[in-house]
């Protein structure tokens, strides 16, 4: 029965393509780690403090290939001894016959977050609930890995960015009326690796994430987000070394469909951020903001990425080099308002010192440019067409990141240290002849430990971070006669920069009870403290940053409950 269930997880995930876990309000994909509003690794989540020390994660982390883009890495290290340690009946069943080598888990969880330490678009009171399952199974000539999950989130008094993952795209749209927002995320993930000949494997991974994001108060909006990734791969291996190659194809898309249906007659405003919080402020259905453009439904934006990844391992050393080129646009049909492209290079290195100790190093370089189209509407014979007159580069951002991680894994005690440094340099040219440059740096350290006392696991985590940021402006043509740089959303800029690069510290505590034959229950509590602008309202203004109030000391509490089953 277990064999059938495990196969169902893996096959279902492959047939209905996943990406790892649901994206939270305060998480964004790695591409945009310094894009603007948030960082994916910015603040550790309270419900993550002990997950790295559980059986499934032990097995996953024991094979450095599992962190690569190559699905064939699933079979590169089949840790029979480790799986047998957690599940002795898996290798040889009660009847003495061989069984599939597999490990899986399923869990349901709920989290409540409260506090003013949050990004500009975050909620002071947020709850989320969801369920997920993951499985790895090895058979004689092939292996499968699968996962699926669902998460529902709801936050109060939310406004600012209208996108699901603020900062992922080089354009953002801000709205100014706080209200309740909900986000539902569905994820499916499947990977398979097959031995096709002596020393050769082929495989592939298919990821899918679908999101529905909505606000039910004017200015209300409904978003539909989609991420899909396909990564076929090949691997050659022998007893000494292994070499792999992966092709990567992915698509990300989102559509913001906004409307005002209230009867109060209030005039609602919006702001389109074209880079470094410079852009255009006006009534939300203004044609320059593009939320209500005739001939286009909503604000559609998408990106297609192509790339390759090369993997190599020798003995206990593993490395992966990845390159990704992305092309995207905002708009549709004749109305293409923005076009952007990017290059991303990343390097991962890992070394297993022995069965207990491992170390990982990663680095990323990301360069993205956005251009704004010059369009002209022409009506001839009652037919309106749009002419493309050219484009101007309005924004460029370059991100650099380095991360170092050390793990000690054992049956009695698990320890994880992480350190990271990230930097962004972005230049906006929204209104000629002015240019603005923003430079931001941030670094953080995290220590996480879990003690296993029989049927009880006690986890503790401490983290700290700091950074700096600076915005400068200059005029490339002082004789142009233009006096204004354009609309500047000063509160968005200051709030986001302080959240990303300000000093912060916090910690998590978790307690897990393990019941035989695999059932467990966990409670965790976390706190983060830092500086934030707690009492302010948005108003696009080109005012002086020095006139802003001093930021407040703010905290945020996380409480999480989880129940699950390891099998």
Predicted regions and their residues:
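Outer-membrane beta-barrel "beta-signal"
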Residues: 24-52, 60, 236-239, 554-567
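Long, internal scaffold/assembly segments composed of regular secondary structure
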Residues: 281-421
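Outer-membrane beta-barrel translocator domains and adjoining extracellular loop/strand segments
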Residues: 114-122, 157-163, 213-221, 256-262, ...
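Residues on the lipid-exposed face of transmembrane beta-strands in outer-membrane beta-barrel proteins
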Residues: 85-91, 131-137, 188-194, 230-236, ...
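Outer-envelope beta-barrel architecture signal
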Residues: 97-104, 140-146, 198-202, 239-243, ...
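Transmembrane beta-barrel strands of outer-membrane/channel proteins
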Residues: 103-112, 146-152, 204-210, 245-251, ...
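Predominantly the C-terminal beta-signal and adjacent terminal strand-loop region
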Residues: 242-248, 256-278, 516-567
């Amino acid at each position: 029965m277990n064999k059938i269930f495990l196969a169902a997880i893996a096959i279902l995930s492959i047939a209905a393509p996943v990406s790892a876990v649901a994206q939270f309000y305060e998480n964004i994909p790695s591409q945009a780690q310094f894009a603007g509003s948030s960082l994916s690794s910015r603040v550790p989540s309270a419900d993550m403090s002990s997950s790295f020390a559980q059986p499934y994660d032990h097995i996953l982390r024991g094979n450095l290939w599992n962190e690569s883009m190559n699905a064939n890495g699933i079979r590169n290290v089949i840790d029979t001894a480790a799986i047998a340690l957690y599940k002795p009946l898996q290798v040889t069943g009660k009847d003495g016959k061989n069984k599939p080598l597999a490990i899986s888990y399923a869990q349901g969880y709920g989290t409540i977050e409260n506090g003013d330490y949050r990004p500009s678009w975050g909620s002071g009171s947020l709850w989320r609930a969801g369920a997920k399952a993951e499985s790895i199974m090895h058979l004689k000539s092939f292996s499968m890995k699968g996962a699926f999950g669902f998460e529902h989130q709801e936050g109060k008094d939310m406004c600012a960015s209208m996108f699901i993952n603020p900062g992922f795209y080089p354009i953002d749209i801000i709205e100014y009326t706080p209200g309740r927002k909900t986000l539902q995320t569905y994820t499916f993930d499947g990977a398979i690796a097959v031995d096709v000949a002596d020393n050769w494997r082929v495989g592939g991974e298919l990821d899918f994430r679908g999101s529905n994001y909505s606000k039910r108060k004017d200015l209300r909006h409904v978003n539909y987000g989609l991420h899909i990734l396909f990564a076929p791969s090949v691997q050659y291996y022998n007893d000494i070394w292994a070499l792999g190659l992966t092709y990567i194809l992915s698509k990300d898309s989102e559509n913001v469909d906004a409307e005002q249906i209230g009867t109060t007659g209030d005039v609602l405003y919006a702001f389109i951020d074209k880079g470094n919080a410079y852009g255009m402020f006006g009534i939300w259905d203004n044609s320059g903001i593009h939320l209500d453009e005739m001939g286009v439904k909503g604000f559609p934006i998408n990106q297609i990425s192509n790339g390759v990844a090369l993997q190599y391992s020798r003995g206990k050393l593993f490395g992966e080099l990845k390159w990704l080129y992305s092309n995207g646009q905002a708009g549709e049909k004749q109305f293409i308002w923005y076009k952007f492209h990017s290059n991303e290079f990343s390097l991962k290195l890992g070394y297993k010192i022995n069965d207990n100790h491992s170390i990982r190093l990663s680095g990323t370089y990301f360069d993205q440019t956005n251009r704004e189209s010059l369009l002209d509407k022409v009506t001839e014979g009652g037919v309106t067409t749009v002419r493309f007159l050219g484009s101007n580069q309005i924004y460029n951002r370059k991100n650099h990141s380095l991360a170092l991680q050390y793990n000690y894994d054992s049956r009695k005690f698990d320890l994880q240290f992480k350190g990271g440094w990230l930097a962004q340099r972005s230049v906006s040219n929204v209104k000629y002849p002015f240019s603005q440059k923003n430079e931001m740096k941030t670094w953080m350290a995290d220590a996480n430990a879990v003690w296993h006392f029989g049927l009880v696991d006690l986890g503790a985590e401490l983290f700290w971070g700091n950074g700096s940021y600076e915005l400068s402006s200059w005029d490339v043509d002082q004789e142009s006669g233009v006096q204004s740089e354009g609309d500047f959303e000063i509160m968005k800029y200051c709030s986001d920069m302080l959240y990303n690069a300000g000093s912060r510290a916090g910690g998590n505590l978790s307690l897990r009870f393990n019941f035989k034959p695999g059932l467990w229950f966990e409670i965790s509590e976390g706190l983060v403290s830092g500086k934030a602008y707690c009492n302010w309202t948005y108003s696009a203004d080109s005012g002086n940053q020095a006139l802003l109030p001093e930021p407040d000391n703010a905290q945020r509490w996380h409480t999480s409950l989880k129940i699950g089953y390891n099998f």
